[in-house]
């Protein structure tokens, strides 16, 4: 993740963590994960982009483990015809970017920037500070 888009890691600190789930298929097994810290000196509200951070994590996982079943393929929120990731994101855009081995972070930036600017303008009248 650091190599492909270090700017997407700005505003937070990532730290390896280990945990032992108490239920489901990994119950009692030591698992590894990533903890996202946003409440210390590394936090920068203007720089932190959580959606991009998660997109980059998906992309890194797809790169390292191409055959890993990243996307849930069973009904989600009463949706029978769309994948959960597409429902959550409102389109196929994120999933298609992650699954495209040739796509780079700048591609996702260029696709999403217009919508982000429109959202910033639309919400600006409602911000109190």
Task: Identify what each model region corresponds to.
Residues 1-109:
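Conserved functional hotspot residues or short segments at active or partner-binding sites
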Residues 89, 127-129:
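Generic, ordered loop/turn and secondary-structure boundary motif
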């Amino acid at each position: 993740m650091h190599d492909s888009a270090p700017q997407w890691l700005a505003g937070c600190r990532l730290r390896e963590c280990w945990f032992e789930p108490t239920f489901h298929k990994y119950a009692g097994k030591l698992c590894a994960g990533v903890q996202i810290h946003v409440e210390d000196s590394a936090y920068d509200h203007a720089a932190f982009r959580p959606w991009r951070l998660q997109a980059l994590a998906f992309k890194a996982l797809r790169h390292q483990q191409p055959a890993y079943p990243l996307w849930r393929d069973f009904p989600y929120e009463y949706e029978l015809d769309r994948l959960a990731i597409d429902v959550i994101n409102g389109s196929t855009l994120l999933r298609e970017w992650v699954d495209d081995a040739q796509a780079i972070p700048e591609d996702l930036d260029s696709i999403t920037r217009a919508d982000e600017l429109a959202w910033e303008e639309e919400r600006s009248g409602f911000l109190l500070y």
